[in-house]
Design a protein with these regions (language model features):
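Beta->alpha turn/N-cap motifs
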Residues: 12-17, 107
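Hinge/capping helix and adjacent helix->loop/strand transition within the periplasmic-binding protein
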Residues: 2-8, 22-106
Length: 109
């Protein structure tokens, strides 16, 4: 932003703005220093969809299947650093499963 720091400028930023601060060393701003959060005005739901050929009907069944088949499942997202990508990586980390991330350049999320 090029506005003077007068307290009258409001910017709406998405999650990737905060995520990028952890992914990239050199940005033209410092997210922690330059931006002061005021309110969370939206929640971004995450939905997990699985191909019907995967024999899992619940999340625990999916986790068990993924652990039994490490690296054989793919996880798609709109792109590196997007909210679905980061939440997918968090899901992998929290469950101890191994899936291959497939980033698509289909849009921003």
């Amino acid at each position: 932003m090029r506005a003077p720091p007068d307290g009258y400028t409001l910017a709406l930023v998405g999650a990737p703005s905060a995520i990028n601060a952890t992914l990239y060393e050199k940005l033209n701003f410092n997210f922690i220093r330059d931006i002061a959060p005021v309110a969370n005005i939206i929640r971004f739901p995450n939905v997990m969809v699985v191909n019907p050929s995967v024999p899992a009907k619940t999340v625990p069944e999916f986790i068990a299947y993924a652990k039994a088949n490490p690296g054989k499942l793919n996880m798609a997202s709109p792109g590196n650093g997007s909210t679905p990508h980061v939440t997918g990586e968090l899901f992998k980390m929290m469950t101890g499963i191994n899936m291959v991330h497939v980033p698509y350049r289909s849009g921003r999320t």
